[in-house]
Amino acid sequence: MISARASAYYTLLCFVLWLALSHPKYSAPSKMIKVKSQRELLELLELRSDEELLELAKAKRNTTARKDLTSVTTTVLVFTASWADQCYYTHPLWVKFANRFTTEKVKFVELNAGRFEKLCHAFRISTSNMANQLPTVLLLEDNVEYLRFPPIDITTGKAGRVVNYKERELMKYFELEGRCLATQDIGIEKKKAFR
C-alpha cells in the first residue's frame, strides 16, 4: 500500500516539473488578428458566404506581376495548431511581422487549423502531424492566393518540409517591407518609387 506522504511528494514533484518544463505563453502586444469563427473570417475578407470562401481557396493562384502595390489589399493568413511544436516556436516571428508591417491595406490573420478544417482542405494544407505543413502562411492579394510558405512543389503537388524559418528570407519571400512602405501614408514622392 502507498503511503499518503509518498503520494503527496510525488504529486508535488509532478506539479513542479510541469511548471518548470511547460512552454511559456507568448504574451507581447500584437497587431495579428486572431480569427475564432467562420463569420469573423468572412467579415475580415469582405465575403458574403462560406461557398465564396471555399471558392477563394480553390481559385487558381495569381502568379502575374503586380504593377502597383499601393492599390492591392494584402492579407497574410497564418494557419497554426496548438499541438504543433513548430507553430509554437514560430509564433513570435509572425507577431513580429504583424507588429512591424501591418497597415490599412496589409493585415495579418491567425487561424487555428483545427477550427477551419474545410478551409485547410480547400487550400491543400494537411493538418496531419506527420505532414509538417503547419504553420502554413498564405499571402492573399485582393483575396486571391499569391504566395504560400511552405511552397507546393509544382511537379509533385506536395508541400515541402520546412526545418528552419529564417526572418530575413521570409521578409524577402513575401515582400513585406515593400508592401508595408507602399501602403503606408508616407507621401506621394516615396510611393512613386514602388510603382
State the predicted function of each range.
Residues 1-68, 176-195:
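Non-globular targeting/processing and membrane-anchoring segments
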Residues 3, 131-195:
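Non-catalytic, surface beta->alpha helical segment in thiol-disulfide oxidoreductase systems
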Residues 70-85:
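Short active-site neighborhood of thiol/selenol oxidoreductases, capturing the structured segment around
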Residues 75-79, 94, 108, 134-141:
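Short, structured motif recognition centered on aromatic/hydrophobic residues
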Residues 81-84, 113-116, 142-145, 153-154:
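Conserved beta-strand elements of beta-rich interaction domains across eukaryotes
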Residues 86-103, 112:
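Typically the conserved alpha-helix immediately C-terminal to a functionally engaged Cys/Sec
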Residues 89-92, 121-125, 150-153:
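Short coil/turn segments at secondary-structure boundaries
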Residues 103-121:
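Thiol-based oxidoreductase modules, predominantly thioredoxin-like and allied folds used
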